[in-house]
Curated annotation (Swiss-Prot):
GO MF term (any one): lipid binding
Chain's role: Component of the adaptor complexes which link clathrin to receptors in coated vesicles. Clathrin-associated protein complexes are believed to interact with the cytoplasmic tails of membrane proteins, leading to their selection and concentration. AP50 is a subunit of the plasma membrane adaptor. The complex binds polyphosphoinositide-containing lipids.
A family per Pfam: Clat_adaptor_s
Gene Ontology biological process terms in this record: endocytosis; intracellular protein transport
Keyword terms of this UniProt record: Cell membrane, Coated pit, Endocytosis, Lipid-binding, Membrane, Protein transport, Transport
Disulfide bonds: none
Domain of life: Eukaryota
Protein name as it appears in the record: AP-2 complex subunit mu
Organism: Xenopus tropicalis
Gene name as annotated: ap2m1
Keyword Cell membrane carried by entry: yes
Family: Belongs to the adaptor complexes medium subunit family.
Annotated TM spans: none
Record has S-adenosyl-L-methionine as a keyword: no
GO cellular component: clathrin adaptor complex; clathrin-coated pit; plasma membrane
């Protein structure tokens, strides 16, 4: 399994080092530094093989985490461990930085001792780890036998992600549906490719060991598994979404999801990601960009861009930014926009148009005259696509939360006693229109 774990700063200095197998030596540390961190060309692959040794690495800010092995391991499992390790460190001391790692190096070694056992990942659930590993170290001397038995049952039991005895004065549940819509559109308005990547993030402040049930859009259609079809959902008369693939938090009972298409679970305490999904059909495109580029001789371009919002008039889009690329030999730009502010940025070779807010079913436009320097280059301007950033208060996939129910029979509180909040946020991913 994992032979060793090393954490480096941007200079290649080792901040944390833990070796689990005898076949990993000091030369592995230097090999990664020379071939990856100090490489002449940027290393794009997350897996690097050097002298029959595999280095699985991720980067957070200026910090490198590298898992090293000489065995044929499951790559997905190693990366899942590395990302989990990043999440655990973030939960304990916030931002992953060189200063924070140096200030908490004892804590990190304690966490590694619990998370990895002889190179095999064991327990990476933050809630369980926080019961006996704190910022001050392992709480062992002042614990009663009862507290120690609770920790043991949580770590080794079926519900390792939640401890017993949690109590809140007010029971609250926050649900965020966060989506990123990606688009590539032709100049004529034809959709060349589009997909939505979504996450359902939950913040749970519930007493006891509550049972939660979560439902969306009548039914989820998982096409690849073939367990639901569009015809099946059409009988209900309600719109449903077709999800291409999805993954769930370990607390979700997958057997019930397969048989009943209901998401039931006992949630961890605090914030966690309930599910992640991807869809490519029936996407609501929040904006359409209509470009018009006209060449006036060899030293002038006229550009006109219209953006149209395609959602309900009662909703407001925010943080709108349109980037219109310009040729490398641009000497000057004159811009006129109906709404917002526009500025030519020579360092980025682009006109950046910003609008604070825009209601649904509206349109706005920008016109620009671009002066060009004479050039001997016979190659035509490639016309890079116009890109757009925005944030809208709905899910572009069409996903809607139908119900969110909570049951806690032991503490005698019901679904009506829980305060629930649901929020939808749609953001642009790579949202481009060719011109």
């Amino acid at each position: 399994m994992i032979g060793g774990l090393f954490i480096y700063n941007h200079k290649g200095e080792v901040l944390i080092s833990r070796v689990y197998r005898d076949d990993i030596g000091r030369n592995a540390v230097d090999a990664f530094r020379v071939n990856v961190i100090h490489a002449r060309q940027q290393v794009r692959s997350p897996v690097t093989n050097i002298a029959r040794t595999s280095f699985f690495h991720v980067k957070r800010s200026n910090i490198w985490l590298a898992a090293v092995t000489k065995q044929n391991v499951n790559a997905a499992m190693v990366f899942e461990f590395l990302y989990k390790m990043c999440d655990v460190m973030t939960a304990y001391f916030g931002k992953i930085s060189e200063e924070n790692i140096k200030n908490n190096f004892v804590l990190i070694y304690e966490l590694l001792d619990e998370i990895l056992d002889f190179g095999y990942p064991q327990n990476s659930e933050t809630g369980a780890l926080k019961t006996f590993i704190t910022q001050q170290g392992i709480k062992s001397q002042h614990q009663t036998k009862e507290e120690q038995s609770q920790i043991t049952s949580q770590v080794t039991g079926q519900i390792g992600w939640r401890r017993e005895g949690i109590k809140y004065r007010r029971n609250e549940l926050f649900l965020d549906v966060l989506e990123s819509v990606n688009l590539l559109m032709s100049p004529q308005g034809q959709v060349l490719s589009a997909h939505v990547s979504g996450r359902v993030v939950m913040k749970s402040y519930l007493s006891g060991m509550p049972e939660c049930k979560f439902g969306m859009n009548d039914k989820i259609v998982i096409e690849k598994q073939g367990k639901g079809t569009a015809d099946e959902t059409g009988k209900t008369g309600k719109q449903s979404i077709a999800i291409d693939d999805c993954t769930f938090h370990q607390c979700v009972r997958l057997s019930k999801f397969d048989s009943e298409r209901s998401i039931s679970f006992i949630p961890p305490d605090g914030e966690f990601e309930l599910m992640r999904y991807r869809t490519t059909k029936d996407i609501i495109l929040p904006f359409r960009v209509i470009p018009l580029v006209r060449e006036v001789g060899r030293t002038k371009l006229e550009v006109k861009v219209v953006i149209k919002s395609n959602f309900k008039p009662s909703l407001l889009a925010q943080k709108i930014e349109v980037r219109i690329p310009t040729p490398l030999n641009t000497s000057g730009v004159q811009v006129i926009c109906m709404k917002g502010k526009a500025k030519y940025k020579a360092s980025e070779n682009a006109i950046v148009w910003k609008i604070k807010r825009m209601a649904g079913m509206k349109e706005s436009q920008i016109s620009a005259e671009i002066e060009l320097l004479p050039t001997n280059d016979k190659k035509k301007w490639a016309r890079p696509p116009i890109s757009m950033n925005f944030e809208v208060p709905f899910a572009p996939s069409g996903l809607k939360v139908r119900y969110l129910k909570v049951f806690e029979p032991k503490l005698n509180y019901s679904d009506h006693d829980v305060i629930k909040w649901v929020r939808y946020i749609g953001r642009s991913g790579i949202y481009e229109t060719r011109c």
